Amino acid sequence: MKRNLLILLTILVCGAVASCKPGQKKNVDMENQKETMLKIETSLGDIKVKLYNETPKHRDNFIKLAKEGMYNGTLFHRVIKDFMVQAGDPDSKNAPKGKMLGAGDVGYTIPAEFVYPKYFHKKGALSAARQGDNVNPNKGSSGCQFYIVTGKVYNDSTLLGMEQQMNENKLTNIFNALAQKHMKEIYKMRKANDEDGLYDLQEKLFAQAQEEAAKQPEFHFTKEQIEAYTTVGGTPHLDGEYTVFGEVVDGMD
């Protein structure tokens, strides 16, 4: 773990590569089909990544910072086995041993760009770090910090259990949002020790939450997700929570 903290970074923009299907003619729309490739040079070897065009704000920001040299000399400051490796903290440049890292930023955030379920947290996914929902309910991304998914392989039954949990979480989130709108009323009831009133309100809000949840489709992993998570692996519980804006194409190992 300590050795991984010393992985120095340099990110170079390699250029754009067109992705045509066999037999497809090149035309004026070709510019929209090019994918930017970057090389992340580390003290343990090079990693080549491509950036998705469907997440233009994240793509352009990443390219901008790379060209400015912002990432040069930074560290992979957070390395968690079977989960991910995180980098991009400007405070990690020349950081002394033992310094707490992870809070550095560039003074701005990027609006979330979820292209889900097309892009998800399979092994090798390049994603943007962000602050938690309690201070960042819109899930905006850090302006500079990113992570690469290492993850682990899951079996079908585990993924099924995760689907069930995500659907239960949806109901809980709806209930909490409804309760938040009644906080003044709840506070008054608590202050007055009105247990019956609190119980009745809870039942009312829970019924509303169930009704609202029933209007939304149940969550299920796609065939592509199941195939990836049961073979190469990943971190499925992050799907739809963090912006995936690219992927590793070489150097993952």
How would you name each of these model-derived features?
Residues 20-253:
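Cyclophilin-like peptidyl-prolyl cis-trans isomerases
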Residues 1-26:
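Bacterial Sec-dependent N-terminal signal peptides
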